């Protein structure tokens, strides 16, 4: 009986249901139109400018946008180097673009925004399988200030054309108060036609840290993925980052950063073992090979690699965990130093910082920083004051100006450290970064190494390439008291260490020579690196049985330290001075 009645009434009820559904859909459409109009009226400085609404579609494991075909003979179509043979006005325009952006934008404008990069990952990465339906969705946040059109748009298209639709919640561009005309209405119009893209404009210049926080506060994704504004994403870059955060929410994961040449736009990525981040005692970020202890821990060449620090421009983090950790230090200005501060905080407060070898993103490293980093010193001081405990003195010894730098109030950041019950910096050095040599800095045995006879002259070492510190001669130069290239340490192993940089250098005397040359320090000091700083100030080289003397360089007005037979001359007397009086 129940069944027959139900069958007879079904068509009528179905019609009524359909009519009600149509009315409901119409009301929802009107409400949606009203909200869109309100959003458009309210858009302005500081407001988000939304792209078109997402529409469901089949095959959501495919990228958000298909990559349009690029002719194989197009400039740089597969990431190869391009060298234009220019003359006259064209050459002038190219040089002007480099002067303005520190990147060859003249060339960038002639390379497709949709070019395909060559594969630069370990072949084992292709075999990885992902549970797309259960991975978290991400908001990709790209902050920019006066960025060139082609590098910015190539970054956006690269994200959309390589990110699975099901995993990408949105792309948020944060305009940090740019004043270039192409980044105003023209950019808004371009982005309005792209799916899942939003534009947020700051009301004033915020700097990288606070601009990224504007994007983070507006983000709807479970994971925040930060990218710089001149990047290109490799196929399969996103899944490994999200998979790792799905496995471990307290993991902050970086892609392998592949170099894109600023002048030729050649993609220089490689599929070999990536490097990890470190720092030197000036609090400057450095790259290092993966230590043997980490290789032993890894079970596969495509496992995540633990890294003491990160470069800072490109990483993914759970939004909840980012907020739990205290996001960024908003007392930091513009950019510089925030990457080390965040790295210390991740490790010391219970997280883990990793690089995933299956995630590759190309990055254009400018010829030099296009904007001032005059706030970077204060940012580094904030990091040292909050996280480094007594080891901050090693930083101040090598950078005396930092002691005098105003750095603002760090009370809240220290309270955050207490609240999260974070570990001390000694734990970080012993557990996370045992490869970093911790200087002794014994009183009276570090600083400027000054000569008594040649008044106001100090040991000085300034290699032409900061990335290749060995093999050059130590000279004498007027003492400046700023640390850096005039900072040396005399150790209990009888070494004279140049340890403002990584890797550290030790002064050596090569066979048959009388000059002082910089070599790499070794675990046990070899004989040609051993000196005795005697009570009278003589600097005695044990192997040669000679003393270091301040001498005039042949056919020159400059001075150098040379080995000579020992005498009682003041030109053979040396003393350390921590800072200028």
Swiss-Prot record:
SMART domains: RICIN. The keyword 4Fe-4S does not apply. Widely expressed at different levels of expression. Highly expressed in digestive organs such as small intestine, stomach, pancreas and colon. Expressed at intermediate level in testis, thyroid gland and spleen. Weakly expressed in whole brain, cerebral cortex, cerebellum, fetal brain, bone marrow, thymus, leukocytes, heart, skeletal muscle, liver, lung, esophagus, kidney, adrenal gland, mammary gland, uterus, placenta, ovary and prostate. Pfam families: Glycos_transf_2, Ricin_B_lectin. Residues 304-366 are annotated as: Catalytic subdomain B. Residues 445-577 form the Ricin B-type lectin domain. Residues 43-67 are annotated as: Disordered. It is a single-pass type II membrane protein. Belongs to the glycosyltransferase 2 family. GalNAc-T subfamily. Catalyzes the initial reaction in O-linked oligosaccharide biosynthesis, the transfer of an N-acetyl-D-galactosamine residue to a serine or threonine residue on the protein receptor. Has activity toward non-glycosylated peptides such as Muc5AC, Muc1a and EA2, and no detectable activity with Muc2 and Muc7. Displays enzymatic activity toward the Gal-NAc-Muc5AC glycopeptide, but no detectable activity to mono-GalNAc-glycosylated Muc1a, Muc2, Muc7 and EA2. May play an important role in the initial step of mucin-type oligosaccharide biosynthesis in digestive organs. There are two conserved domains in the glycosyltransferase region: the N-terminal domain (domain A, also called GT1 motif), which is probably involved in manganese coordination and substrate binding and the C-terminal domain (domain B, also called Gal/GalNAc-T motif), which is probably involved in catalytic reaction and UDP-Gal binding. The ricin B-type lectin domain binds to GalNAc and contributes to the glycopeptide specificity. This is Polypeptide N-acetylgalactosaminyltransferase 12. The gene is GALNT12.
């Amino acid at each position: 009986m129940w069944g027959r009645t139900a069958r007879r009434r079904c068509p009528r009820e179905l019609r009524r249901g359909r009519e009600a559904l149509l009315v409901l859909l119409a009301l929802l459409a009107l409400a949606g139109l009203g909200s869109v109009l309100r959003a458009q009226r309210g858009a302005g400085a500081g407001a988000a400018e939304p792209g078109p609404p997402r529409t469901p579609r089949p095959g959501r494991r495919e990228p958000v946008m298909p990559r349009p075909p690029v002719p194989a003979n197009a400039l740089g179509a597969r990431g190869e180097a391009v060298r234009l043979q220019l003359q006259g006005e064209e050459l002038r325009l190219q040089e002007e673009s480099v002067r303005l952006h520190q990147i060859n934008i003249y060339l960038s404008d002639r390379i497709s925004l949709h070019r395909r990069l060559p594969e630069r990952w370990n072949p084992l990465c292709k075999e990885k399988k992902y549970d797309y339906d259960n991975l978290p969705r991400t908001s990709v946040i790209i902050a920019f200030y006066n960025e060139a059109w082609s590098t910015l748009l190539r970054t956006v298209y690269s994200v959309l054309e390589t990110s699975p639709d099901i995993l990408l919640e949105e792309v948020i561009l944060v305009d940090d108060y740019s004043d270039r005309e192409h980044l105003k209405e023209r950019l808004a119009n371009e982005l309005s036609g792209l799916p899942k893209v939003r534009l947020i404009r700051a009301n004033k210049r915020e700097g990288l840290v606070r601009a990224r926080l504007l994007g983070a506060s507006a983000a709807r994704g479970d994971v925040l993925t930060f990218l710089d504004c001149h990047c290109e994403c490799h196929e399969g870059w996103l899944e490994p980052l999200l998979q790792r955060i799905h496995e471990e929410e307290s993991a902050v994961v970086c892609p392998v950063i592949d170099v894109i040449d600023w002048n030729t736009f050649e993609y220089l990525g490689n599929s070999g073992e990536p490097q990890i981040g470190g720092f030197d005692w000036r609090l400057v970020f450095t790259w290092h090979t993966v230590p043997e202890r980490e290789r032993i821990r890894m079970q596969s060449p495509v496992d995540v690699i633990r890294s003491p620090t990160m470069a800072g421009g490109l990483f993914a983090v759970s939004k909840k965990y980012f907020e739990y950790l205290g996001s960024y230090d908003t007392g930091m200005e513009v950019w510089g130093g925030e990457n080390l501060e965040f790295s210390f905080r991740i490790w010391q407060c219970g997280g883990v910082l990793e690089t995933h070898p299956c995630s590759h993103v190309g990055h254009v490293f400018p010829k030099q920083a296009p904007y001032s980093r005059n706030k970077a010193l204060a940012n580094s001081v904030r990091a040292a004051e909050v996280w480094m405990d007594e080891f901050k003195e090693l930083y101040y010894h090598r950078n005396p100006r930092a002691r005098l730098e105003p750095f603002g109030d760090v009370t809240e950041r220290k309270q955050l450290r207490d609240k999260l019950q974070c570990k001390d910096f000694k734990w970080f050095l012993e557990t996370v970064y045992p490869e970093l040599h911790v200087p002794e800095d014994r009183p009276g045995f570090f600083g400027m190494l000054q000569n008594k006879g040649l008044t106001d002259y100090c040991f000085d070492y300034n290699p032409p390439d900061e990335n290749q510190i060995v093999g050059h001669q130590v000279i004498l130069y007027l003492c400046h008291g700023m640390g850096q290239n005039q900072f040396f340490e005399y150790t209990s192993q009888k070494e004279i260490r140049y340890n403002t940089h990584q890797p550290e250098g030790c002064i050596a005397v090569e066979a048959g020579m009388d000059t002082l040359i910089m070599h790499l320090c070794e675990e046990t000091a070899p004989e040609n690196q051993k000196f005795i700083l005697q009570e009278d100030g003589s600097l005695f080289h044990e192997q040669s049985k000679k003393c270091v003397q301040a001498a005039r360089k042949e056919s020159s007005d400059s001075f150098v330290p040379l080995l000579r037979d020992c005498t009682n001359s003041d030109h053979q007397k040396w003393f350390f001075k921590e800072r200028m009086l």
